[in-house]
């Protein structure tokens, strides 16, 4: 169970950082490729 908790925290932290950078700086890649 601890492995799942640590994995969840790691993924959530990376996700928050990714979205923070994503919304802070507009991506140069076309939005169609992301969807």
Swiss-Prot record:
Keywords noted in UniProt: Chloroplast, Membrane, Photosynthesis, Photosystem II, Plastid, Thylakoid, Transmembrane, Transmembrane helix
Compartments (UniProt record): Plastid, Chloroplast thylakoid membrane
Membrane-spanning intervals of the chain: 3-23
InterPro entries: PSII_PsbT, PSII_PsbT_sf
Listed GO CC annotations: chloroplast thylakoid membrane; photosystem II reaction center
Protein topology in the membrane: Single-pass membrane protein
One Pfam family per UniProt: PsbT
Biological process according to GO: photosynthesis
Keyword Chloroplast: yes
KW Transmembrane helix (keyword) present: yes
UniProt subunit comment: PSII is composed of 1 copy each of membrane proteins PsbA, PsbB, PsbC, PsbD, PsbE, PsbF, PsbH, PsbI, PsbJ, PsbK, PsbL, PsbM, PsbT, PsbY, PsbZ, Psb30/Ycf12, at least 3 peripheral proteins of the oxygen-evolving complex and a large number of cofactors. It forms dimeric complexes.
Role this protein plays: Found at the monomer-monomer interface of the photosystem II (PS II) dimer, plays a role in assembly and dimerization of PSII. PSII is a light-driven water plastoquinone oxidoreductase, using light energy to abstract electrons from H(2)O, generating a proton gradient subsequently used for ATP formation.
Family recorded in the similarity comment: Belongs to the PsbT family.
Protein name, UniProt field: Photosystem II reaction center protein T
Source organism per UniProt: Bassia hyssopifolia (Fivehorn smotherweed)
